Structure formats: structure tokens, C-alpha cells
Amino acid sequence: MKRIWALFFVLAYGLVSPALSGARGYLFIIGGGDRPENMMRRFVEMAGRFGNGKIIVFPMASSEPEETGEGLVSEFKALGARRVESHVLTREQALSEESARLLDDAGGVFFSGGDQSRQMAVLLHTPLHRRLLELYDQGCVMAGTSAGAAVMSEVMITGEERRQPEEGHEFEVLEAGNIVTSEGLGFIRTAIIDQHFVTRKRHNRLISLVAEKPLLLGIGIDEETAIIVSPDETFEVVGGKSVVVYDGTRADTSVTPSRLIALRGVVMHVLVAGDRFDLKTKKTIR
């Protein structure tokens, strides 16, 4: 019966192949909240090593994209970035082949916080999206905070659930099929990214997805904290708080008649600044 339920998860929830990307770029994935200056300075320095070092900001996730973009431009310039541009695009603009030229000379791209679905409504499957993937393959640094962290993975948490809870009672159960996902940018295909993780108590939704997609790691990044994913598929934790990793690869998963998820044997890691993790072996690096 347990094997039948495992097959059910694969068929019903579209398990994604965890093939390694082989990209030469870096991911700088921030869990939201305040951004420590030393952490962000590292992003600026990394972006300066590729192309002509220009940083492109895409703030379309924000409800106030112009103001958000201007703020990020000022932040990066204050940290030493020489060339920073913010572009607020519509879906129509992103569908234009000319949109990809906005990324000429880019060494780093930064995706703002806000609503990740709003960002993806503009970018998904456009010439600009394809160019972003090409640049990542070539060595560019892709960074984002909060919603901009969520868009990094191929399977993206939207922040919604299928049941209709009362306000203040969101994500209170581990229930099969409850967590809504959609397609992200796909820079990382071996894990699902969640953000504001410990601060906003988001364990329930990520554990649910790990149960449903057991070949994908669940990586929950807290505020003021980031992971830097290198081309060798390892990541380092930087910042002031924690990163939680759930590994359900060898877990025993089942679902009750009332659709509650049971997950036995899941591995959990709680990582802090300086810790490193191998996405291939699913183990910490000592």
C-alpha cells in the first residue's frame, strides 16, 4: 500500500527530475527581511566578476515596482556596484526578442521581493527567461530575496493553498495536495525553495511538498540569511540566521483516508553561517 501511495504522489503531483544543471553560474538566494551589508557586498563583488559586472534588477514582484527598483539600485551602488539598472517590464515587453538585450553585459541579476506569481506572470517562457537561463549557464550570478528567492526553483511555492482556511489559520495541517505550486525560473531543479522560513513558521507547507515530491529537497531560508549555490552543486550559508533542509529521499510516505500526510524517516538539517551542503549527495560538507 505504501508503494502505491508513493506512485500516487509521482503521478498526481508531477515529480520533477532532479537532473543536475551543469551551469557555471552562481545562485545567491536570500530568505527575505533585512539584508546585512556584508552579505550584500559579497553579491556585488561576485556579480563584478562576470561580463562587465552590470547588475540588472527586476522588481516586477513588488506592488510598487518602480520604488522598489530605485531602492535596490541605490543599495547596490552604495555597496560599490558601478553599473546598476532596474527594469519594470510587462508580459508583452518580456515576449519581445529585444527584451533579452537588456541583459547584455550583465554580471548579476536581482529579483525583488513581493509576489512570486506576479514576477513569473511576466517572465515565464519568454525570450528574456531563455536568456536568463543562458546567462546562468555561462557564469552569471542570479540573486533574489523573498519572492525573488521562491522563483529560483523549477517547482515554485506560490504561497497559496487549495483549502480555504480562515484568516490566521493558514497551513495548519499536513494535507496531501493542499500546497499550490507553479513553475519558477528553473535555475535549481533539485530542490524547492521557501523563504522567511523560521520567522514565519513555514515548516508545514515545505514538509508537505517534500512528502509529495520526495526526490526534491526542501530548503527553507530564514530572514537575513542566504545560500550561495556554486557550479559544483554545493551551497554555503551566509547571514545571521538559519537554513533548514528537508530530505525525504528515503522517507516512507503514506496518506490517511482523511488525506493527512505521514512522513517517516525524513532527514532534517539546520544550518547556520559557514555551513556547507552538497545537493548531489544530500549531505553536509565538513
Regions found by a protein language model. Give the residues of each.
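Catalytic nucleophile loop
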Residues: 112-113, 136-156
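Bacterial N-terminal signal peptides
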Residues: 6-16
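Catalytic-core regions built around general acid/base machinery
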Residues: 102-105, 125-139
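Positively charged n-region of N-terminal signal peptides that target proteins for export
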Residues: 1-4
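Glycine/threonine-rich flexible loop motifs
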Residues: 116-126
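C-terminal and late-domain segments of enzyme folds
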Residues: 20-51, 66-78, 156-158, 162-286
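ATP/NTP phosphate-donor binding region
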Residues: 44, 53-102
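Structural motif
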Residues: 29, 108-112, 143, 194
